[in-house]
């Protein structure tokens, strides 16, 4: 079964949406519950596909997961953790990349882990080499088997001195989840320090972990023998908040995003203001709106935190197609993130992608033949067309482009968007979008 979204564009999105816990934190906090010897409670949990996948994987490994029918809070009890068959893991994981993060906690809990061949959004190589190398440095034995990789640690996991060649969020999460119960001290240099990483550290600290974050991207973890449970409210999803902000700009709308956090979005908010977007920052959220005038072009470079997030880039590029002048966007985090512009060009956008680094500083992709810089000329009138969603953020970007376009667009592959956007079609309907959903076999 697959769904097709038929969008009739040209209607400004106006109204209110609510944003809950971050996709880039909640599944990892759920995995962290495996490390404890007591139940954990996770609050502010969104209803997204990634949460469903992790719930299934944890239940498969013997973890009891109970969802509060009223507020959606999750209670996770790992006391009966057990091994699971590779076939079952593969069936439950689907195309999620979460299973790699289960490895450290599973080794601590039951002595072994299996990860199927991984999927995820098709926006770059996203190699798991960092993860496997990290696990080896902790003393894990990594074996390739049919359909995936088996990981064990006959002598247990031991602290290590680890240096990442790039501040990878996934590799940093792997270190945190593996080191907290490893014997000895782990020192991680070149770590990612995104707000979701800090929130994961807060979760682990509540469980009894000893973790310190230094100013030079170094994280120090003192291993402890046992951890308890946690009671934690997940931080809000800054990526979803930024997506709705861009949607307001693209459709000349006015959206109040309940739950949007100024503290975690300051770099985005500065850029939004430079483009010409309006905002009113309140205690419970942020109002984003098109001020009625021209949008300004800009030069933008994505980077790791505290820079401009790569996940913010794609929706904002759609807004830049409506800016008056030439904008330049240099993507330094994922090498193939501009594939989504093909559909925008078919809709009438004027976008050229380049292999050269068009930012202020040459990046790691400059000599590797990747199309990682874009030149956007505007404003251009977007026209409806048929679109197949390529990845999570690119897919949402296509949606808001279709909502701003003249005419009708047919969007397929929208199930991908459910991975990170809670009830997005309900929210679109509440904002006044004109669309229909049909289901095909």
Kindly give the residue locations of the regions a language model identified.
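Short, structured segments at the rim of ligand-binding sites
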Residues: 1-441
């Amino acid at each position: 079964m697959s769904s097709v979204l038929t969008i009739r564009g040209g209607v400004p999105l106006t109204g209110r949406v609510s944003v809950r816990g971050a996709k880039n934190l909640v599944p990892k906090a759920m995995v962290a519950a495996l490390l404890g010897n007591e139940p954990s409670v996770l609050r502010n949990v969104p209803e997204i596909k990634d949460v469903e996948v992790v719930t299934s994987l944890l239940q498969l490994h013997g973890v009891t997961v109970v969802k509060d029918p009223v507020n959606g809070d999750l209670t996770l009890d790992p006391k009966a953790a057990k091994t699971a068959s590779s076939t079952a893991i593969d069936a439950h994981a689907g195309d999620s990349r979460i299973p790699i993060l289960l490895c450290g906690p599973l080794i601590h809990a039951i002595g072994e882990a299996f990860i199927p061949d991984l999927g995820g959004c098709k926006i770059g190589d996203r190699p798991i080499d960092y993860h496997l190398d990290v696990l080896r440095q902790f003393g894990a034995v990594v074996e390739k088997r049919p359909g995936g990789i088996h990981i064990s640690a006959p002598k247990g996991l031991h602290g290590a001195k680890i240096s990442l060649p790039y501040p990878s969020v996934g590799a940093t999460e792997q270190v945190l989840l593996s080191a907290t119960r490893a014997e000895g001290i782990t020192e991680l240099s070149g770590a990612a320090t995104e707000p979701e990483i800090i929130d994961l550290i807060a979760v682990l600290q509540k469980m009894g972990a000893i973790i310190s974050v230094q100013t030079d991207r170094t994280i120090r973890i003192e291993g402890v023998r046992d951890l308890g449970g946690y009671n934690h409210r997940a931080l809000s999803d800054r990526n979803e908040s930024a997506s709705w902000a861009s949607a307001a700009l693209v459709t000349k709308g006015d959206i109040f995003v309940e739950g949007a956090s100024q503290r975690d979005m300051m770099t985005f908010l500065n850029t939004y203001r430079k483009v010409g977007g309006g905002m009113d920052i309140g205690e419970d959220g942020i109002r984003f709106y098109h001020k009625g005038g021209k949008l300004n072009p800009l030069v933008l470079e994505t980077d790791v935190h505290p820079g401009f997030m790569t996940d913010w880039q794609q929706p904002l590029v759609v807004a830049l197609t409506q800016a008056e002048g030439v904008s330049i966007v240099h993507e330094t985090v994922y090498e193939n993130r501009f594939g989504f512009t093909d559909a925008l060009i078919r809709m009438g956008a004027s976008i050229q992608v380049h292999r050269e680094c068009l930012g202020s500083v040459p990046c790691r992709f400059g000599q590797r033949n990747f199309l990682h810089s874009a030149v956007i000329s505007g404003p251009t009138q977007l026209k409806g067309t048929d679109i197949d969603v390529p990845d999570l953020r690119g897919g949402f970007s296509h949606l808001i482009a279709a909502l701003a376009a003249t005419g009708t667009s047919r969007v397929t592959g929208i199930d991908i968007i459910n991975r990170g956007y809670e009830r997005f079609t309900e929210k679109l309907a509440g904002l006044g979008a004109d669309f229909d959903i049909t289901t095909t076999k």
